[in-house]
């Protein structure tokens, strides 16, 4: 289920049909983002490939890298991050992964590859977040 308005739609639905597909990614949801199987009328099992991913936005340009250096210098330990798609966010994410920053949080719409690099570098733990402490939140 999506992290948007679908929970409200389910409350008004006459029938609820879900597809279970082991090839689709799954993320732990917050209240209202999951559905109890007892509320489901029909289950369709599928093994279709995952929905095509968006491109990563390409390699950062020299300007992207220069601006990213200025941005990363302003990020404090414990900051909560949001990154988008494109050369600039890729450059920012790469520099964060290589930095001395720590205790970072994630609260973002899109979980882009740069977040994987930052997480693998041990920079993300969400310890300082006021909301959803310890969790990486994405839609």
Regions found by a protein language model. Name each.
Residues 1-139:
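Conserved phosphate- and dinucleotide-binding cores of soluble alpha/beta proteins
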């Amino acid at each position: 289920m999506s992290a948007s308005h679908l929970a409200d739609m389910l409350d008004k639905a006459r029938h609820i049909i879900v597809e279970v597909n082991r090839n689709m990614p799954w993320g732990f949801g917050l209240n209202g983002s999951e559905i109890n199987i007892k509320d489901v009328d029909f289950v369709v099992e599928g093994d279709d490939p995952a929905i095509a991913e968006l491109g990563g936005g390409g390699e950062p340009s020299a300007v992207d890298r220069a601006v990213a250096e200025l941005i990363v210098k302003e990020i404090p330990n414990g900051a909560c991050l949001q990154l988008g798609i494109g050369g600039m966010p890729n450059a920012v994410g790469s520099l964060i992964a290589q930095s001395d920053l720590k205790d970072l949080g994630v609260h973002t719409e899109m979980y882009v590859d740069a977040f994987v690099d930052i997480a693998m570098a041990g920079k993300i733990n969400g310890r300082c977040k006021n909301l959803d402490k310890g969790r990486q939140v994405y839609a």
